[in-house]
Amino acid sequence: MGIRIATFALITLLAACGEGGKPAQAPAAAPSPAAPTPIRLQLNWVPEPEFGGFYAAQFDGLFRDAGLAVEIIKDPGGGSVPQLIARGVCDAGVVSGDQILQLREQGGELVAIYSVFDHTPYGVMVHAKDAPESLEAVWKGTGNLAIESGLPVWKWLASRYGPTTRTVVPYGGGTATFLADPKAASQCFITAEPATMDVQKVPVKVFNASESGYDPYTVVVAVKPGQVPDPVLQRFCAASQEGWKRYLATPSKYNPAIAALNPAMSLEAMNAAAERMRPLLDTPWTRANGLGSMDPARWKAMAEMLMQAGVIKSAPESSAIMRPMDTTPSKP
């Protein structure tokens, strides 16, 4: 065995020699690609169409191609996403625009980098038959109104239209009570309750909260200042924007995989939700400035509304709570 090994070694050495008996130069090894930068994106709900573009970016390898290893983490189950961001448990998290302003009032430092919805998906849902003509008419109507009374949007409506004349009942998260009462009104999120009604073939009319002027950015990706380098955020936003372009173009391509992550929501409901939310993402602003981009003037107006409603006492500068998005990809 020792002779065979020695002979093989000699043959290998001779074969490796070039002219003049000098060893041939081994070809230079190709540089190894840089390891992808990990990003932990914490959702504030379970996998659903309002996160579809992020999943599209993941499924299509857009994050990978941007030098990122993005982990999309579903709803923390009662945990506070802002606290998870502040503690470094996640690198970025999904919150609402009015939540960022309230946190700022309390000393928080979250900065918005990408907004999925250009117009808020929150509103009030009523039965289509004999429906009122406006959000104000709903607010001043009769019958039950199921809402989470502590939310800023309802405080704004009270400051804008006066106290509601409806009987306020707790919002339980389902639609059974709404279905049983033809005069009922209920808070809704455009991809949830209205999509459920579409699947069940129940005609409804949805009054968006923006009708009252209350139009916060929603499904907002926020970060702690300095926690993630700007070039990394830039690549994340660029990949996310492309993911959202693809999702809005063909949501049916991605919804089956999203539905597999969330069996509680049917594929039919996801497809209905995608169509319901499209007008709130594809707007004149986003067509001119890009999906995910935000207008500093909108942040200023939102802060002023929250002050008027008594939710916050002072309005921060827009530059302190949002980062202008540059979707020109930088090199990984």
Question: What are these model-derived regions, one by one?
Answer:
Residues W299-P332:
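Conserved C-terminal helix/tail region of periplasmic/extracytoplasmic solute-binding proteins
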Residues M1-I5:
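Positively charged n-region of N-terminal signal peptides that target proteins for export
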Residues A6-A16:
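Bacterial N-terminal signal peptides
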Residues C17-G21:
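Bacterial signal peptide processing site
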Residues A26-Y171, F178-C188, F207:
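Short, glycine-/small- and polar/acidic-enriched structural segments
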Residues V116-M125, D198-G226, C237, R276-L281, ...:
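Periplasmic-binding protein-like
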Residues D91, D98-Q99, Y171-A264:
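Pocket-lining segment of extracytoplasmic ligand-binding domains
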Residues P229-A309:
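Secondary-structure end/capping motifs
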